[in-house]
Amino acid sequence: MRKVLDEPFGNPSSGHWAGRPARVAVENARNEISNFLGCKPQEILFTSGGSESNNHALKGVYFASGKPNAQIITTYIEHPAILNPCRFLEGLGAAVTYLGVDHFGQVDPDNVRRAITPRTVLISVMHANNEVGTIQLITDISKIAREHGILFHTDAAQSVGKIPTRVGELGVDLLSLAGHKLYGPKGIGAL
């Protein structure tokens, strides 16, 4: 990591000689992450961290829907990086449904199904909870989202690198991660 932070000084988006090594480093990282997550390299958007990734997922889907009263389904146990953008979107007219959990911290997929309305554009449920360790039934929830044609996001900052987190197997459309949670530097994330 130190080598990458110290040596390729150029802007990876520039076309000149100083940017080329940085561009190679970024693309190598993109390929490694895509192999690790089981997705295509072009599906990875690098961000400044997990919070920015979550903001892009929530706000991006909401604004792209074109529905000012669109519904987002999430849970009460989400990280503030999910809850705060949801509150922001509520201020703009979004309907955010917050689901409770059982005594193990588990979201009941049937409660997700019951919360869906014709206005639902996104379901966002964290993969693993950092406080109680609960691993959510993401594949079950993703099937429900698919049945209804709804996009599904999971904040996987706490799970990536600790448990299998393959995008295709989970069935998610959007997955957020934070670099510092898996031996990367602070200030790096991906969606």
Question: Where do the language-model regions lie?
Answer:
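Pyridoxal 5′-phosphate
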Residues: 1-191
